[in-house]
């Protein structure tokens, strides 16, 4: 499901969600248009929870919004992905900017907690404060998607 980063949940989002529910289609949402004026990806996530009544968490955080949008932080790998080139088609991977590390840790913890509800191994690792492998996170995400 694609959501507008400015308008959030729109009438067609509700229609698409209704059809996805009807046919038991797992849902993964993308927040688009983060380079537009008034963009706020958190409104999209809040709308998914409040309007569509689904559990939603961020798996990426934008680096800048509107004309300052430069890339995203991957909360699974905990790396910053910058989109360079004339059309943003060249990906440059770097460490997370210092001014975004705290937010990245916060949203990663929310994501890990949410998807761990569907994977006992991951839940155990979280409770024991163990390092969580990327493969374990991917498995938990897959399980969370098919249990909607």
Give residue spans per PLM region.
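Redox-cofactor binding/interface segments in oxidoreductases and associated redox assembly factors
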Residues: 1
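P-loop NTPase catalytic nucleotide-binding module
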Residues: 4-146
């Amino acid at each position: 499901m694609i959501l507008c980063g400015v308008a959030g949940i729109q009438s067609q989002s509700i229609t698409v969600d209704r059809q996805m529910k009807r046919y038991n289609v797992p849902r993964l949402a993308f927040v688009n248009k983060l380079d537009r004026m008034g963009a706020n990806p958190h409104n999209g996530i809040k709308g998914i929870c409040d309007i569509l009544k689904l559990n939603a968490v961020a798996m990426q955080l934008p680096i800048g919004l509107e004309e300052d949008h430069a890339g995203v932080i991957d909360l699974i790998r905990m790396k910053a992905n910058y989109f360079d080139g004339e059309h943003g088609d060249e990906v440059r991977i770097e460490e997370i900017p210092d001014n975004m590390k705290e937010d990245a840790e916060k949203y990663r913890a929310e994501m890990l907690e949410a998807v761990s509800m569907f994977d006992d191994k991951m839940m155990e690792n979280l409770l024991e404060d163990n390092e969580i492998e990327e493969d374990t996170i991917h498995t938990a995400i897959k399980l969370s998607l098919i249990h909607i």
